């Protein structure tokens, strides 16, 4: 685990974005942890979040020309990541996001920001079923651009309804790399460093045993 990944876990815990306990997911599964990126909801939170996304992007080595944030949660992520790349990595890159509803006046269309072209890095909070990615792929392809990769905050590394995860399905279906700031493996490594969190560690390991990929 790299320093920025440990810092991200501590940041998420401090904002209660990451919680340990017992939570029922939309899938009906009982999970020993929950991650709600919507709680990164202040100016400082967003500034820090962008720095973590930018760090993960640079760390990945994936080459891309433009950031794309799918509506709605991806919009502030794309924006703050673009700012962080410019301020902290001297990479001044364009960004773009979509509207859920196309405009029929003003500039029109369903895209806001830079022209959607070249190699596109899609940024979002998490991938649950991969629906947002599939919708975004239609937009990217319709504009003649290509998907360079996908960056999310957390990879839960768990199976979907089949034997592979939603993330592995996206990688397979679109022949792209999905990267994350942290993974379930990183969470477990973090918990292993904290004796006071032994109870949560046991629960998370048991969950991984049952649903992990």
UniProtKB/Swiss-Prot annotation:
Coiled-coil segments on the chain, per record: none
Control of this protein's activity: Inhibited by sulfate and phosphate ions.
Cysteines joined through disulfide linkages: none
Superkingdom field: Bacteria
Record's subunit section: Homodimer.
Function noted in UniProt: Catalyzes the transfer of a ribosyl phosphate group from 5-phosphoribose 1-diphosphate to orotate, leading to the formation of orotidine monophosphate (OMP).
Name listed for the protein in its UniProt record: Orotate phosphoribosyltransferase
Organism expressing this protein natively: Escherichia coli (strain K12)
